Amino acid sequence: MKVLPAKKVEGVLSVPPDKSITHRALILSALAESESTLYNLLRCLDTERTHDILEKLGTRFEGDWEKMKVFPKPFAEPIEPLFCGNSGTTTRLMSGVLASYEMFTVLYGDSSLSRRPMRRVIEPLEMMGARFMARQNNYLPMAIKGNHLSGISYKTPVASAQVKSAVLLAGLRASGRTIVIEPAKSRDHTERMLKNLGVPVEVEGTRVVLEPATFRGFTMKVPGDISSAAFFVVLGAIHPNARITVTDVGLNPTRTGLLEVMKLMGANLEWEITEENLEPIGTVRVETSPNLKGVVVPEHLVPLMIDELPLVALLGVFAEGETVVRNAEELRKKESDRIRVLVENFKRLGVEIEEFKDGFKIVGKQSIKGGSVDPEGDHRMAMLFSIAGLVSEEGVDVKDHECVAVSFPNFYELLERVVIS
């Protein structure tokens, strides 16, 4: 699909519900002691996998994704393997849950997910007492023999909300306390939600301490996804004639790293929290920012914006001076090798960019000429290069653009709403 340059970009929009929070709301409601009501869940390929696995384990769901009632039941061993699709969150979080049930399960995924590392969850969960068998001890398919677990103190090798969440979810049914210590802070939805549900959780910096507990069902409205909003917010800053407002979006401080970096770069941007519902929710406003300055992204912000880091390269094209991202090797272990895909495709569009093992450097100001790109089936890269097309000279042809359905099924629909061509 060819995305042509836009004359003007303007509008007020709300983005789809938060994917990370939807996964966790579904899982926690299935683990609760009584029924829950969930509002505004994101329905996409990834979250459907979590829903379907929980259903196969015995959880009963009623209603639709705008209002869903969840009736938990004790999990029963499934007869067939459980399909995780392309969803790393489903795989890693459900590994933690399933490790704590004395039954046998098998998780498998598509070819992209089957290349993503799982040793990082296998290791701590085996220390707690579960048994795993995986391809090369690291990749899906993966068999889990759950057990009665013991709490552990575990230092994660990388800052990863998925690994932290897997261990904490396993710890809910373990004997004794579970402690997770990260090298840097990662998004905190799991511990924040558990704490709000009355589970004894203490957070001190990068250390999370959890005591085993049960909790009652709950009511929750899922806010808009800041990672989806990010594409529109960046577009608003780099387009020469733009004003965009995003409403009802999640503003959890462990997710606003991109907004912080944009402020450092001098973007015309502001955000405010308007309500709290297990998570802070609010509004982001952005307009054309002609005086962007290059920046070295601070290391402590990298895990708080891992999904948004490639967008920093797009900002860097239109910023004066050097924009540098380092300590982001984790980007190579996403749905695609996002560093390689970013660099190769930017070069196709006439942008000069330098690749590092753990990041990239771009020197602005430059322009995006146009051309064809291949996001390699990665939803976030397809959206990034679609935004690039709107600020290019000749337009950008995005191969396999349908892959955006993984997280943002109505992305192009919303884009059409704000673009004046």
UniProtKB/Swiss-Prot annotation:
One of its GO terms (biological process) is aromatic amino acid family biosynthetic process. SUPFAM superfamilies: EPT/RTPC-like (SSF55205). The keyword Repeat does not apply. 3-phosphoshikimate binds at residues 19-20, 24, 160, 162, 307, 334. Gene3D superfamilies: Enolpyruvate transferase domain (3.65.10.10). InterPro entries: Enolpyruvate_Tfrase_dom (IPR001986), Enolpyruvate_Tfrase_sf (IPR036968), EPSP_synthase (IPR006264), EPSP_synthase_CS (IPR023193), RNA3'P_cycl/enolpyr_Trfase_a/b (IPR013792). GO terms for molecular function: 3-phosphoshikimate 1-carboxyvinyltransferase activity. It is found in: Cytoplasm. It catalyses: 3-phosphoshikimate + phosphoenolpyruvate = 5-O-(1-carboxyvinyl)-3-phosphoshikimate + phosphate. The active site is at residue 307. It comes from the Bacteria. The keyword tRNA-binding does not apply. Keywords: Amino-acid biosynthesis, Aromatic amino acid biosynthesis, Cytoplasm, Transferase. Pathway: Metabolic intermediate biosynthesis; chorismate biosynthesis; chorismate from D-erythrose 4-phosphate and phosphoenolpyruvate: step 6/7. Catalyzes the transfer of the enolpyruvyl moiety of phosphoenolpyruvate (PEP) to the 5-hydroxyl of shikimate-3-phosphate (S3P) to produce enolpyruvyl shikimate-3-phosphate and inorganic phosphate. Monomer. HAMAP family: EPSP_synth. This is 3-phosphoshikimate 1-carboxyvinyltransferase. It comes from Thermotoga neapolitana (strain ATCC 49049 / DSM 4359 / NBRC 107923 / NS-E). The gene is aroA.
